[in-house]
């Protein structure tokens, strides 16, 4: 059966057809569509596949470990910075091993289209000593899922699959299986000595995983996804990984004249690389992200070949690749006999018309006119756009949950007033522990939890704390007297400003919750309601 699928959708369909029992994820571009596809899949509903959003990536990874412990196949999805959040269980999952297969799907974002950095997740796979896959097209993304699950169960290791933005968000026709594999049965074969990571047991597992590394490398050498393609002109060779291989092939519609080593499975296949460095005078390494392969080739490969790539300037050190960049690196002429597209009028990002965050920033800015030394610590979400004109309201945005802890640290340093602004989903993701720290030390900060009843930035997914924030804050020790809820509307501006003024001047932890539904989800709900009424 053929389907036209996004890269993310091909991954999701591949997981379902491979006998998936549960997907665990926190939404983050460019990975969000994987979980959404599974949530909407008739096959997933028929089979009872667990597909709910997790509070954060760490809880997602740990839940997947629990499913694997019981012998079922699990998928964990996140964007690249989410892998930092779940690094503890991710790395330790190599020590526990797997019972049912686990695939950790990480979507990297070269050029930082919607992220605060462009870190390369392949380093995590190497660090954790587990197999890593990087599809070069949507068909490979689909096919790799079944093979990755088999690999995970055979090796008793999780498998990391890395995709990038262009792979995740481009479409292609994918040949899918006619019939999906059956889901694993529940089993109790997990050995307690593997899963209880006391030092005595963990040392043994560490030795086992270390001893597996030559096998993983040989599997990469033998993998059908790592191909050595001979070329007539051996002056230059090209090593291309993931989607960069597609860009290379686009440069040569009639076939590349140089030897090409396509890499889509790691650890790097040293035998194949050695063949190229022995045969070729120059080797260009084309890879999305950091010079992961290039660093290793320079460090461990013998041979006389001159290595070129991101570290030598033939390719840009940062940002995405494209066919023109690869042509230039190969010394080819870049065609200019085409009419360029007309410049698109600039459309800077902005908070939506009618968004409750706008009213919050308007009130906050007006109050802080009386406090010229005030500092507002922001967080990750739609409200980060409050940094831009016309509000220019926040002074920092580092990572999920940092607003509260940075405000506390600034207060510890003597800053007043110190205000944190954080969204509802980000608060439950990683803000609660920071608030607990602040309460325990009676920090002099004001926390604004801007609650729009959804995870708006990534498309309106459910927020774990909806209708629970007052109870959560009370449970963390916030005083009832200094826990306020307001409705961010222009007509309520006087009340909102008065509340902010009062809580800033309270010397302790205070929390303000401006609550109003996201305009985008509100419009969607109204459309759904009208459609239902017509039936």
Locate predicted features.
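Short acidic, glycine/serine/threonine-rich loops at helix termini
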Residues: 34-37, 63-65, 86-90, 112-119, ...
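Thiamine diphosphate
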Residues: 1-138, 164-166, 231, 257, 387-511, 517-532, ...
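Flexible, low-complexity linker and terminal segments
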Residues: 1-12, 18, 135-351, 356-357, ...
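Short beta-strand segments
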Residues: 77-78, 103-107, 160-164, 239-240, ...
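A glycine-rich helix N-cap at a beta->alpha junction
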Residues: 45-54, 96-107, 185-193, 440-453, ...
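Short, acidic loop-beta-alpha module within alpha/beta folds
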Residues: 71, 233-258, 401, 405-407, ...
């Amino acid at each position: 059966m053929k389907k036209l699928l996004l890269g993310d959708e091909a991954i999701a369909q591949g997981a379902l057809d491979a006998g998936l029992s549960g997907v665990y994820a926190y939404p983050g571009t460019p990975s969000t569509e994987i979980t959404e596809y599974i949530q909407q899949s008739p096959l997933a509903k028929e089979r009872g596949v667990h597909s709910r959003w997790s509070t954060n990536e760490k809880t997602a990874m740990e839940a997947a470990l629990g499913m694997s412990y019981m012998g079922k196949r699990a998928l964990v999805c996140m964007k690249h910075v989410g892998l930092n959040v779940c690094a503890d269980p991710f790395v330790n999952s190599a020590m526990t091993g797997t019972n049912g297969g686990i695939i950790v799907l990480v979507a990297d974002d070269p050029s930082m289209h919607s992220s605060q950095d462009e870190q390369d997740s392949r380093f995590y796979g190497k660090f954790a000593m587990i197999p890593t896959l990087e599809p070069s097209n949507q068909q490979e993304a689909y096919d790799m899922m079944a093979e990755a699950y088999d690999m995970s169960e055979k090796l008793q290791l999780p498998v990391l699959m890395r995709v990038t933005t262009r792979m995740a968000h481009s479409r292609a026709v994918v040949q899918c299986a006619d019939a999906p594999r059956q889901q694993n049965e529940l089993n109790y074969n997990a050995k307690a000595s593997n899963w209880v990571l006391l030092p005595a047991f963990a040392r043994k597992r560490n030795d086992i995983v270390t001893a597996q590394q030559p096998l993983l490398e040989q599997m990469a050498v033998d993998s059908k996804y790592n191909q050595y393609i001979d070329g007539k002109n051996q002056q230059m060779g090209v090593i291309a990984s993931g989607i960069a291989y597609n860009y290379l092939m686009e440069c040569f519609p009639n076939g590349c004249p140089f030897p090409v080593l396509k890499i889509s499975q790691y650890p790097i296949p040293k035998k194949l690389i050695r063949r190229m460095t022995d045969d070729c005078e120059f080797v260009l390494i084309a890879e999305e992200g950091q010079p992961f392969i290039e660093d290793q080739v320079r460090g461990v490969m013998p041979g006389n070949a001159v290595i070129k790539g991101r570290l030598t300037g033939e390719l840009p050190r940062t940002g995405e690749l494209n066919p023109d960049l690869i042509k230039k690196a190969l010394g080819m002429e870049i065609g200019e006999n085409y009419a360029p597209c007309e410049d698109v009028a600039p459309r800077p990002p902005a908070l939506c018309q009618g968004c409750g965050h706008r009213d919050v920033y308007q009130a906050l800015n007006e109050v802080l006119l009386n406090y010229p030394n005030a500092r507002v610590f922001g967080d990750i979400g739609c409200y980060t756009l409050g940094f831009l004109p016309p509000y220019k309201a926040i002074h920092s945005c580092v990572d999920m949950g940092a607003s509260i802890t940075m405000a506390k640290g600034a207060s510890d340093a003597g800053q007043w007033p110190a205000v944190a602004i954080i969204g509802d989903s980000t608060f439950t993701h990683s803000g609660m522990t920071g608030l607990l720290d602040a309460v325990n030390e009676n920090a002099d900060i004001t926390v604004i939890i801007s609650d729009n009843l959804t995870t708006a930035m990534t498309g309106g997914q459910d927020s774990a704390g909806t209708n629970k924030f007052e109870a959560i804050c009370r449970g963390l020790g916030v005083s009832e007297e200094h826990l306020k809820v307001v409705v961010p509307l222009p007509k309520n501006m006087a009340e909102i400003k008065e509340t902010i003024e009062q809580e800033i001047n309270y010397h302790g932890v205070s929390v303000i919750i401006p609550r109003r539904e996201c305009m985008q989800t509100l419009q969607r709900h109204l459309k759904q309601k009208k459609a239902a009424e017509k039936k």
